[in-house]
């Protein structure tokens, strides 16, 4: 029976720490400290809601799908933005986009492992998303909303594109936590409830 959660956010935060040396920020994630969402995070939520209601390719899909899979002592867990026709979709807002930005996102390997019947994972990305509110001239105290959206970039990945498996990533994560004396904190804070 699985003992500890592993989420894409946790692994991505760890990866960011390794690449950018922000151990303090990773420890906050590891300790599940609350934080105030940044403007970019808030725009990401709004972009996701907009896409669920308006993007033709994903209309009628299953949204906010909770997925999990036991993996030894670990329970891989995530929430898929949209699952439709054997494809996992994830909506991403980022201020600065470069081609291949999400290639190293652990979300891809995790989701394709947890949903083995999915053929691929598709990221639908924009670097411009502005919500514009204006007064509706026909009604007092009612505002109308419009959106100014930039290009929607697309990244598609299949499991066979990656040199590492999720098993390898989890092993490296576990060893790194032990090496930095953080494994005990992890097992305390990320213990499965059930």
Predicted features and spans:
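Metal-dependent nuclease catalytic cores that hydrolyze phosphodiester bonds in DNA/RNA
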Residues: 1-87, 185-194
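Charged phosphate-binding loop/patch that engages nucleotide di/tri-phosphates or the phosphate backbone
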Residues: 169, 174-194
């Amino acid at each position: 029976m699985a003992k500890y959660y592993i989420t894409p956010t946790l692994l991505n935060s760890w990866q960011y720490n390794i690449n950018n040396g922000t151990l303090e920020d990773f420890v906050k994630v590891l300790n599940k400290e609350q934080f105030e969402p940044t403007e970019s995070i808030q725009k990401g939520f709004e972009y996701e809601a907009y896409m669920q209601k308006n993007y033709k390719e994903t209309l009628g899909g299953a949204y906010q799908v909770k997925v999990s899979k036991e993996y030894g002592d670990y329970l891989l867990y995530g929430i898929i933005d949209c699952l439709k026709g054997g494809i996992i979709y994830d909506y991403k807002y980022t201020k600065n986009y470069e081609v291949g930005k999400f290639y190293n996102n652990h979300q891809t390997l995790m989701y394709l492992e947890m949903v083995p019947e999915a053929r691929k994972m598709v990221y639908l990305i924009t670097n411009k998303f502005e919500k514009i509110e204006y007064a509706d001239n026909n009604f007092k105290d009612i505002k109308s909303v419009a959106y100014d959206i930039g290009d929607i970039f697309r990244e598609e990945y299949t499991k066979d594109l990656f040199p590492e498996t999720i098993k390898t990533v989890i092993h490296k994560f576990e060893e790194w936590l032990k090496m930095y004396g953080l494994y005990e904190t992890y097992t305390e804070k990320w213990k499965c409830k059930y």
